[in-house]
Every structure is written in structure tokens, then in C-alpha cells.
Amino acid sequence: MRGRMALKKSGIICELREVLLRKKPEAMILISPKGTVPILQLKDESVLDESLHIMRWALNIRDPDNWLEKIDESEALIVELDQVFKKDLDRYKYFVRYPEHPQVYYRVLGEKFLVMLEERLIKNHGKGLSNTRTTFSDIAVFPFVRQYAFVDKTWFDQTPYSFLKIWLTQHIESELFLSVMHKVPPWKLGDEILFVGITPDC
């Protein structure tokens, strides 16, 4: 979703093809044999197959809200997200696949990242992770915090991370996020073309 949000914000119009990962279309594998999502094929037929790369590509073309400001200061946070927290999140969500520890063990590992986010938000008066407004790091991070929170929403709601909970709610309820969350049927050859990025200034 973070890649799609950046495309929407930048106003770059792309053809949207929703896929079921358990039934990957041949056209997808031909474009990117890695077989993971998201995938963005550019006009020159080069391929971006990491959401962060898609975000940077789109925002380097058009960045109406200056999300890329202080991007260098966000690198450590994003590395921690992608290399540590996402692994902890995966184990927390799918703990039955990792029976060497109970689910709460993986929750505690992921909670360390929440503590760091809360500290950043306190520093920025609750407005953002890297600035006193929404920037690249907020959009890159919040979809994964959302996933973590909804594994056990009752537990998350009683945590002491008040700034984090408000920040997360604001992003979940934002017009931009809601605009890219609508469900579309899985793509198949011959389908009517759907687009993302038509409205540039959400």
C-alpha cells in the first residue's frame, strides 16, 4: 500500500493489476520472476519490485507535499523497519509457523519498534516520525504498524503508546489511504484497465 500511496500522491497514472499470490498470472512472472508484490513496470520495461523503490521513484518525479524532506534522517528507521520489524511482525502474525516460541514472544520483539516510534512522535509533538508533519517515513512505516496493531487490537488499544495510537488512527482514516484501499477483483487478461494515481492531490 505504501507504494500505491506514493503513486497516488505524485499523480503518476499507472495501470493497476490486482493479483492473488496463490494464483499468480503468467504475465506477472514474465515481468518479475521473483513473484512478489508490488511490481511496477516502467515505460522502458524496467521493473521496480520493492515498495520503497516505487515510493522513491514516484516522489522523485513529483513530490507535492515534500515527503522526501529529511529523507536521509529516515534511513536508519526504515532499515530497522524492513530488516527487523517486518520479520518480527511476520512471526507475530503467523506464529503457528514458528512453534519454537509462543506468540507473545514475537509480540514483545515487535513492541521494541513501537517504543522507538512513540519516542520519535513525542519529539515531534505527535505530528510525524521524522518531522512535525507527514513525510516519507510515516507513509513507509504506518501500514506495517497497522498490521501489527490488528493482530490483537484489544491488546494494542490498552498499550501506553498514546501518540502512536493517535498517529496510526489519523493515517488509517486519511483520504489518501482510504483511496488506495478499495478492493478490486484479481486481474485477468482482457479485463478493463483500472488506474491508480489519477487524482494527484489527495
What are these regions (language model features)?
Residues Y105-F113, T159-E173:
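Extended, well-ordered alpha-helical scaffold segments
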